[in-house]
Amino acid sequence: WDASTEGRERVVIDTPRTKSVIGFTDGDAFDLGAVTIRPGVTRQGWSTISVTLMEGEGFGEAGSVLIAATGDVENTNMGWKDATRTSVGRNWGEAPSLVEAVTASVSFAVGSHRVSAWALDERGQRAEEVDVVSEDGHARLQLGPPHRTLWYEVEIR
């Protein structure tokens, strides 16, 4: 937990199987070894982006990866008491929940020819392929609202 700069508080997780940035991270780049996460601008300046190795020995090896990326969350017609958004009292709203799909890029320290990616639907099934581009010899994919998802699958060959 890094709370050294007011308004930029964040948690960075860097383990062999999970890389994650949580908090007020808009516009910063996080080089976590074989994975780099660059959160974009969000409604509240806050997001959570997690990159988890589901299969394989490491992010530079063959395997599969799950990415989850979210920002602002609230129920439909949720009634905040004031602009600080610290309480809704008893006005929790109703379904469906509304979740901000954040803009971010995630890069892997492997060639783009080794990587395929998909946006996942609400059942965890592949919904559409996501472009993977080469940037400085690394495979980079762009997350965001056009994909209409919070979850992505990445396959490294």
Regions found by a protein language model. Name each.
Residues 1-119, 123-126, 136-138, 145:
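Long, low-hydrophobicity ectodomains and other hydrophilic envelope-associated domains
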Residues 130-133:
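Alpha-mannosidase-like glycoside hydrolase catalytic domains involved in N-glycan trimming
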Residues 137-157:
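C-terminal beta-strand-rich structural cap/linker in extracellular carbohydrate-active enzymes
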